[in-house]
């Protein structure tokens, strides 16, 4: 799978352009992407019109931020006249990149100014990001007590956890909590010789609350290997293949030390010799088989406290997992404290299987499952799976922009809508998007598509070059 580059689009109508004096600048409103404010800067100087992309350092972040992007700036008029320039730049100490002389000021006035306004669009694709602000991982202190049944102590720090959930993912912890260890049955157990920070991150990743990054992947992977938590090892490997900015040589070293064969194959394909690549292929299948479905049938009874019946199939699950992510299910459990079995009507059992897998953190959403998971997540008020579906659709899905726009409209997903529109730039993709029932489109979506269509109908393309 290709690396998950982030793509977004900034667009702004600059008004009262004639009032912008020499050596003056005006800016579009800040728009937040990845915790960083972005904006378009328009500058008038020496009869030249400068256009710049600004990536400001967040005010609450002391880290050294680096963002490498390719970007395309488009100046367009309502008649379809268009002028485009593209570049690749690194934002860090320098927070603004662009062109002092994007176009001659008088040319802009004659060709692009309509009602004293101009339209500027900037399409941005990130190549690498580092040092950006990160949300804090989920707390496992007393505030998580409602959704816990035990405490794990690491370096004098208490983590309130759900024992059956951890046992579900980790055979070692299953034996520790429920096996022949002396700690079995105790409300509090202590883990020695590990980092409390790494354990915190490991829990957060298991609970699907925290993103792995280049700063924490080493500690998480070492601990996941030590405790043998397969799903976290898999997620670390996937990140190192798809999202890491670490040099290939370092990733290859990690692959060797942790026996991550898929990562090793990926790294050798990028930096290895012909003999090394051939050797890697010899020990690895050319196609990774589709993962087996995680079973929530009676074999999972030991790690469950409630049953859901869907299309005559029984799913043995934990109340706390469902309740912690869904106000709908939390209400059901509160109103039916002693009830052990519930029936869900009019939903597909395969969709429910996929949804539960996402909730348990054992499934990666794909193009085959995303719509079913999204439908149930919306139906049962589950923000977390919805967020995961949107992230997949924006970053990794191979669905067409037209399909994504349809999904965005059905579930009112504005971020997905904006990302899909940013991908629609070629004539064929515009035609495909406009081929659906335009009466069902949001006005702003239709307007954006028509503007893009006007550009491609124009015979006056002064300059076009793009990395996209």
Swiss-Prot record:
Checking InterPro entries in the record gives:
BTB-MATH_domain_protein, BTB/POZ_dom, MATH/TRAF_dom, SKP1/BTB/POZ_sf, TRAF-like
Which UniProt key words apply to this protein?
Repeat
Which residue numbers delimit the BTB domain?
148-215, 304-368
Q: Which residues form the MATH domain?
A: 7-124
Q: Pfam families of this UniProt entry?
A: BTB, MATH
Identify the PROSITE patterns for this entry.
BTB, MATH
Name recorded for this polypeptide: BTB and MATH domain-containing protein 45
């Amino acid at each position: 799978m290709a690396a998950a580059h982030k793509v977004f689009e900034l667009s702004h109508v600059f008004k009262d352009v004639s009032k912008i004096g020499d050596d003056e600048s005006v800016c579009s409103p800040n728009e937040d992407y990845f915790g960083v404010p972005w904006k378009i800067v328009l500058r008038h100087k020496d009869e030249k019109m400068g256009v710049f992309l600004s990536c400001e350092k967040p005010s609450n972040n002391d880290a050294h931020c680096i963002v490498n992007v390719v970007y395309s700036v488009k100046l367009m008029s309502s008649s379809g006249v268009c002028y485009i320039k593209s570049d690749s730049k690194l934002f860090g100490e320098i927070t603004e990149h662009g062109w002092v002389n994007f176009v001659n000021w008088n040319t802009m006035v004659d060709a692009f100014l309509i009602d004293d306004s101009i339209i500027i669009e900037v399409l941005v694709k990130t190549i690498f990001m580092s040092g950006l602000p990160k949300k804090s991982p989920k707390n496992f202190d007393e505030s998580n007590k409602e959704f816990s049944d035990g405490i794990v102590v690491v370096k004098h720090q208490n983590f309130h956890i759900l024992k059956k959930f951890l046992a579900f993912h980790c055979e070692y912890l299953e034996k520790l909590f429920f096996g022949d260890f002396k700690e079995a049955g105790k409300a509090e157990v202590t883990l020695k010789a590990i980092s409390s920070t790494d354990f915190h991150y490991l829990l957060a990743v298991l609970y699907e609350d925290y993103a792995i990054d280049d700063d924490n992947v080493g500690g998480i992977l070492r601990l996941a290997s030590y405790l043998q938590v397969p799903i976290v090892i898999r997620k670390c490997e996937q990140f190192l293949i798809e999202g890491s900015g670490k040099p290939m040589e370092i990733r290859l070293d990690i692959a060797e030390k942790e026996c991550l064969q898929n990562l090793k194959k990926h790294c050798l394909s990028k930096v290895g010799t012909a003999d090394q690549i051939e050797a890697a292929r010899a020990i690895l299948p050319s196609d990774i088989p589709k993962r087996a479905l995680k079973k929530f049938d009676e074999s999972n009874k030991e790690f469950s406290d409630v049953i859901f019946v869907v299309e005559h199939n029984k799913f043995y699950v934990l109340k706390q997992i469902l309740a912690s992510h869904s106000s709908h299910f939390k209400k059901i459990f509160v109103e039916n404290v002693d009830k052990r079995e519930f029936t869900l009507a009019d939903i597909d059992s395969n969709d429910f299987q996929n949804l539960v897998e996402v909730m348990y953190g054992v499934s990666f959403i794909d193009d085959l499952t995303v719509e079913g998971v999204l439908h149930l997540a919306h139906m049962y008020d589950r923000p977390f799976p919805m967020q995961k579906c949107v992230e997949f659709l924006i970053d990794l899905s191979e669905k067409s922009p037209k399909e994504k726009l349809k999904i965005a409209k059905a579930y009112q997903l504005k971020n997905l809508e904006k990302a899909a529109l940013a991908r629609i730039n070629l004539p064929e993709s515009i035609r495909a998007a406009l081929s659906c029932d335009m009466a069902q489109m949001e006005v702003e979506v239709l307007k954006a598509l028509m503007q893009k269509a006007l550009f491609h109908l124009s015979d006056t393309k002064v300059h076009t070059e793009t990395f996209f």
